[in-house]
Every structure is written in C-alpha cells, then in structure tokens.
C-alpha cells in the first residue's frame, strides 16, 4: 500500500547507503523499468510480522497496533510521533490523529480534494499546522476542528517552522517566507540561490537557519529576515538541519558533514565522504551520530569534529539513546542496539518490508513501525 508514498520514498532516500544492502535503495521519484520491477516485488512481499523475541533482545516490547483511517486507495504521506499522539497525512488529504497510549483514533478528517498535496504538518501545543501547496490549516488537536484556514498565495515545499505568530516556509523557487497567521499576509520574503527542500529551523530566540539545494546557508532574523551569518557549500541536503544553539550541523549531498558557527558562519569542522551523505544525523548531549559510506556509523564530538568511534560494518539513523548506554539504530533493513561508548553491536533483529520508522523522543523513546498494510505498531521499553 505504501510503496509509492512520500513516506516510503523519503525513508528510502535517507537510508540508502552503499554499505547497507537494502532493497530500499531501489526506490526513486522517477519511474523506470527497473523501478516497475521493484514495485512489483514490493507488492508481492510478505506482510511484516512482529518478531517478539527479536524486539525483546533490543529491550523493547510490543504494546499495540493501530490503524489510521485513509481514503480508499490512498497511501500515508507523512507520519510524526509525539509523547501523547501520532499524526498521519494520507495522499487523499486525510489527517488522522492516534492516541499514543492506546493506538485508538482520536479523530480523522479529509481536509481537501483527494488530489491535494500536503507537506508534513507540525505541532505547537494543542494546534496542528497542516499546509497544502497554497493553504494553511490550523486544527485543534483535541477534536480536529478548524481553528483557521488561510490562503498563502505561494506554492510551498517544506513543512512550516512555527515561531510566535509566523509560519515560515521554503519553496522550490528558492524563496523563504514568513506568513503572519493572525492577519493573513506575507510578512517577509528572502531569496536563496536554489530550491529549498528542508524546513528552516530556529537556532536562537532571534534567528532561524535555512539551506538551499545549491548549498547557500543563512541565518535570518525571524521578525524581518535581516541576514545574520552566511556560508556556502557545494550542495544541498536530503536531511533536516540540526542545531545545539552553537553550531549548525549539516549532512550534505556534496559528500561531507559540516558544523558551522550560527553567529558568524565560521566552519568548525568538516568530515568528507566518497558519497553524498543522505542518512539523517542525530544530535544528543554534545555528540553527533552520523553515517557515511566510508566510515559507517560514527560518533562525533560536535564541538571539535573528532570521530570518537566508528563502526564501518553498520550504518543508519540513530533513533534514540536508551538507558544512557545504548543507541537504537535503524539501518533500513534491521534494528540494532549499539553500545553508546564503543559502537559495538549488542543486539540486532531483521526489520524488512516496512514503510517507515518513527520515534517520539531522542532519549528512551518509543519506536513506531509503519507497515505497507496501513497499520502502525508501537514498541515501548521493557
């Protein structure tokens, strides 16, 4: 059901590594003969089933399986996990909210025509901000009622960054703009040198940061878009930007990992790779976990760029740090528990034939598995 969805394609793109022999790497946004064969293989793949023993070795146990409502023939485009809820957006413009404790549907509604495209929604307090190409919905998370609906007059391409009463979007035309939600107008606009495909992030009380796919990096004053620091690299990114309030951390398609000073743009460090870095990196308590083809999974001192350890035999997305001693890592075809201090494999279990993985917290987080059949399964710490 999900093999054609944005959720699956994003998962495939961000977890494709030459060192990881995963079938996810065959998925792309352009349909070819080989893609059609891969789609046929995916369609005939056996349904995913829960390996309770394997999850137990990772220190997790199954808690529930839920089913976000979708329109007939629709697929899940976006999924986000929070402490208390999960949000889903289907290709039929259906937004659904499930209770994190039980998996029950809190509410579900179709916002627009089934052909309308939505970016990933974001939450602030009890409001969900869901944006289509040109409109922004503010929805009550309690019952799904519409609080406000605004036309933005611009084709957006990223999730919104919500700061006070501003919703900040990026576009394929390279425009980063702030929409003033209370009075329904575009407050400011800033032109980058190429398409913006990742959402802006807040780096301080006064500034946000964004990157174009041509490698232009800038911080802008949130209230007026006055330029702060700027930097330039040779490519954009397939992953979200990260910050600790000191550095801006980028996994770049120009085959490098970077850290830049958010104040003046000084490059703290750079780690090169022989391939574009496409796996989402993770920042936790002064350590950056990232994967490249050359070094596999790495633990990097975020301040200095020193590689504290690396394991060239594995690579993937670090979902959560558990018990302050282990990393839970999804490689694209298996889930692993990794020793946080040395990078050694503690436990592993196969995890194939799924559409995506989400967690609700970088520290001791729950793990949610989204299946091709349209279900979501929650696994909590034992």
Set out the residue ranges of the language-model regions.
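Bacterial N-terminal signal peptides that target proteins for export
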Residues: 2-15
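C-terminal motif of bacterial Sec signal peptides marking the signal peptidase cleavage site
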Residues: 23-26
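Repeat-blade elements of multi-bladed beta-propeller folds
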Residues: 30-44, 70-93, 113-137, 150-177, ...
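A short helix->beta-strand "capping" segment at the edge of beta-propeller domains
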Residues: 48-74
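A short beta-strand motif characteristic of beta-propeller blades
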Residues: 62-69, 104-110, 145-150, 185-190, ...
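Beta-propeller domains
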Residues: 90-102
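Short loop/turn segments that connect beta-strands within beta-propeller blades
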Residues: 99-102, 140-144, 180-184, 221-225, ...
């Amino acid at each position: 059901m999900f093999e054609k969805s944005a959720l699956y394609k994003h998962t495939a793109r961000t977890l494709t590594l030459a060192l990881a022999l995963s079938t996810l790497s065959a998925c792309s946004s352009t349909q070819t003969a080989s893609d059609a064969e891969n789609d046929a293989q995916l369609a005939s793949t056996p349904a995913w089933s829960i390996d309770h023993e394997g999850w137990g070795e990772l220190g997790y146990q199954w808690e529930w399986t839920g089913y976000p409502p979708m329109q007939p023939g629709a697929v899940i485009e976006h999924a986000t996990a929070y402490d208390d809820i999960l949000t889903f957006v289907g290709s039929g413009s259906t937004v659904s909210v499930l209770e994190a404790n039980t998996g029950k549907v809190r509410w579900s509604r179709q916002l627009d025509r089934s052909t309308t495209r939505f970016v990933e929604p974001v939450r602030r307090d009890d409001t969900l901000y869901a944006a289509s190409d040109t409109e922004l919905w503010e929805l009550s998370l309690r019952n799904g009622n519409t609080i406000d609906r605004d036309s933005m007059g611009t084709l957006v391409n990223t999730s919104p960054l919500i700061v006070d009463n501003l919703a900040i979007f990026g576009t394929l035309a390279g425009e980063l703009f702030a929409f003033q939600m209370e009075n329904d107008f575009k407050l400011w606009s800033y032109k980058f040198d190429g398409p913006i495909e990742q959402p802006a992030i807040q780096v301080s009380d006064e500034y946000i940061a964004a990157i174009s796919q041509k490698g232009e990096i800038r911080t802008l004053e949130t209230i007026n878009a006055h330029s702060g620091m700027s930097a330039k690299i040779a490519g954009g990114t397939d992953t979200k930007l990260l910050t600790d309030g000191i550095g801006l951390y980028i996994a770049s398609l120009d085959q490098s990992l970077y850290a830049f000073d958010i104040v003046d743009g000084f490059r703290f460090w750079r780690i090169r790779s022989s391939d574009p870095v496409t796996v989402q990196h993770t920042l936790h308590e002064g350590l950056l976990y990232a994967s490249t083809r050359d070094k596999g999974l790495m633990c990097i001192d975020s301040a200095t760029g020193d590689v504290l350890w690396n394991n060239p035999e594995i690579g993937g997305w670090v979902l959560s740090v558990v018990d302050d001693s282990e990393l839970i890592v999804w490689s694209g075809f298996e889930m692993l528990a990794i020793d946080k201090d040395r990078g050694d494999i503690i436990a592993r279990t196969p995890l194939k034939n799924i559409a995506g993985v989400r967690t609700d917290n970088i520290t001791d987080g729950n793990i949610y598995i989204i299946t091709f059949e349209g279900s979501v399964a929650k696994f909590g710490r034992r």
